[in-house]
Amino acid sequence: MNQLHDAVDSTNLPLGPPIRGKVRDCYRLPGGRHGDAMLIVSTDRISAFDWILPTLIPDKGRVLTAISAFWFDLFSRGSDPVPHHLITTDVDDMDLPAGIDRGPLRGRTMLVRRAEVIPFECVVRGWLAGSALAEYRASGTVCGEPLPAGLVAGGRLPAPIFTPATKAASGHDENVSYAVMAERIGDARAAVLRGQSIDVYSRGAAHAAGRGIVVADTKFEWGRMADGSVILVDEVLTPDSSRFWPAATAGSGRVPDSFDKQFVRDWLEASGWDKSSPPPELPADVVAKTRDKYLDACRLLTGSLPAGVA
């Protein structure tokens, strides 16, 4: 575990080479009492514009894990539970080899069922912002689908829309039409993913609204199990995967400030960085404010901060 000033940059557990994403280090754990499982460790790395930034955000990995675990639990309840991959976030209940220091893993680690990830980001938008706003202003469409005239920046859409993107292992995810997605994975599977994604978004947005947060948009990932069933995987409704706005300022005719990494994107845009060369270090005040935004999102959505975080 590589830690810099209490922030975790990367992990090197004796579990074989990890699969490193932009934020997470993943290890396969086959053959334990939980079956074919994966260990997902959320580091404090942050990415923007398809680059991993050189600066860490302390406690970010704990926030992502706490929020995802909250949603997985919430969506498991009721008469229509959402199947998902999370087994536990309790490191003492994980079948790890003797000698592994579990301390640095606490609060930032999920043990999950292994699934074949379907290679599309399932994006759901309820409000107009980001690349959707730019496309709408240019053509009146989002991902090629026409929208009513007269929508404003940061405005609510008539209904949530599904706008998939190709999922890249590294590099740039590309927005595609629903028709392209259906052609690649089949009409039936595409329809299931669209319906389930909009349903989970709507349920999450309703909970967030009761906590004073608007979920402007988010992205989900789904995985296929050996029996053909589809389950919710990766992270869910976090500040990395979503735009969270204060409800009090949403719908004012401009895109509000947010509880997510848009603050970092905005700073990078204003810094003069060309997005084709390695990104600059984030200043200390940007790091501190970003951390505060993530903690605020966690506190508002879940009612508490991650264990051990003040």
Question: Positions of the model-derived regions?
Answer:
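C-terminal helix-cap and adjacent tail motif
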Residues: 236-297
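A short small-residue
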Residues: 48-51, 174-185, 272-278
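Coil-to-beta-strand transition motifs
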Residues: 35-37, 117-119, 212-215, 227-230
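A short mid-domain helix/strand-loop element embedded in enzyme catalytic domains
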Residues: 155-187
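Active-site loop/lid in soluble adenylation, ligation, and acyl-transfer enzymes
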Residues: 2-165, 275-281, 285-310
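A long amphipathic alpha-helix within ATP-dependent nucleotide-binding catalytic cores
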Residues: 185-216
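Short, active-site-adjacent segments that bind or coordinate small-molecule cofactors and metal centers
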Residues: 113-115, 210-218, 223-225, 291
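Conserved metal-phosphate-binding beta-hairpin within the catalytic cores
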Residues: 124, 215-236
